[in-house]
Amino acid sequence: PQIAMANSLGMRVIVTDHHEVPYIEENGERKEQLPPALAVVDPKRADDTYPFSGICGGVVALKLIQAITEKTGNPGLVNIQEELLEFAALSTVCDVMELKDENRILVKEGLKRIQKGYNEGLKALMEVNDIAPDRLSAYHLGFVLGPCLNATGRLDTAKRALELLQSFTRADAMTAARELKDLNESRKNLTVQGIQRADEYIQEHHMAEDKVMVIYLPEVHESIAGIIAGKVREKYHHPVFILTKGEDGVKGSGRSIEAYHMYDAMTQVKEYFTKYGGHKLAAGLSMREEDIEPLRAALNKKCTLTEDDFIPKVHIDVAMPMGYADDALAGEFALLEPFGTGNPRPLFAQKGLVFQAGFKMGANKTCARFRVKTPEGTTQTVVFFGDLEKLGAFLDEKYGVGSEEVLYAGKGNFPLSVVYQVSQNTYKGKTEVQFVMQNYC
């Protein structure tokens, strides 16, 4: 309706997007439903010839600027493109695009610009989060800087993030950065509460048998629905929709598993939505409250997932003794960065690692360092940033109640098979190989 109105007023509209194009099926063929704009720039269009369709919305906008630059020859736009590179990197990582092909180069070069501190706002945001420029990685974009920038739009107004990025003085940037960090802490607390409420809802509504979880949490802020959906998806390994009460009906976000194309599944039941859109693994929607239970029933009726699809699978690159990883090998892995979705850090595995001692680390003791003895007779240090409570329960179940306490007392003798990553850790000017445990059994 908005574009039609703009057209009626003599305005010309260009739409940029990167989501799947809405479609209807007629006689077994998909017919895309495009808005009546002057141009619709979307690499997901069936007739689009751009060689890489996996770019985010921010990069699509950057491509439009590049096209305008080529057409007009405006030299000022050339400089703008370079300045926008760091924001293209941020948007690529924060929208969970695969870090391959063009995206990998965009993020790699964007990280270099952020490290050099061209933008006062990003430099300040790194400082308040204790991120040294030379340690900056795609992880920090997606899990530290990005959430701080998004928190203001989720809980307040996105203008505050924009003001940070437009700061010209260090003083203004630091003030804005501290405010965003505080807002993100509030967002984290609300997210934890939302996850707890989602767990309660699953139990109360007997959703253990549902293949697709449709969870209605009216009291949850709509801006954090996607984060909660992602956390619940990780825990249960099911497709998840988190619905909340919006200003005009119900709004929600979905997060899916690899075997379930969420956007296609939603298209099959689109009569329940007033608006929807998204990708294979993530989606957003608006709907009427009275249609929540019918939607839950319809999605589950049409779902063809099997029990095997709900079992998380860990795919390692190769089984490798920890003793094989030296400084040279760890340095070569660094050449493969930036790591992230679509370009994960290599995964290795070794059996028979005997856990002898453990030491909890961090301000809240939420991570740990373990001393392990390898089958080759060497001693290695393994760090773990996962769920320590879950690890402790696993040890107590496998080796008897009290095993966790024995391990942290330095008297452990618990053989485990471990999936791990190899990285480099620099502390007080000294760089050494670090083994990061990802899974265990």
What are these regions (language model features)?
Residues 14-18, 41-42, 215-216, 242-243, ...:
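General beta-strand structural signal in soluble alpha/beta enzymes
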Residues 9-10, 28, 36, 70-297, ...:
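Hydrophobic helix-and-loop "lid/oligomerization" segment in the mid-to-C-terminal part
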Residues 5, 9-10, 15, 23-24, ...:
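Acidic, glycine-enriched active-site microenvironments
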Residues 51-59, 222-227:
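Short, conserved micro-motifs enriched in small and acidic residues
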Residues 20-21, 36-49, 60-69:
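A short, charged helix-loop
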Residues 19-24, 30-32, 47-49, 247-250, ...:
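Short gly/pro/ser/thr-enriched loop/turn and capping motifs at secondary-structure boundaries
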Residues 1-33, 40-43, 197, 223, ...:
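N-terminal small/polar loop signature for handling phosphorylated ligands or for N-terminal nucleophile
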Residues 170-178, 182-216, 268-441:
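Mid-to-C-terminal polyanion-binding domains and interfaces
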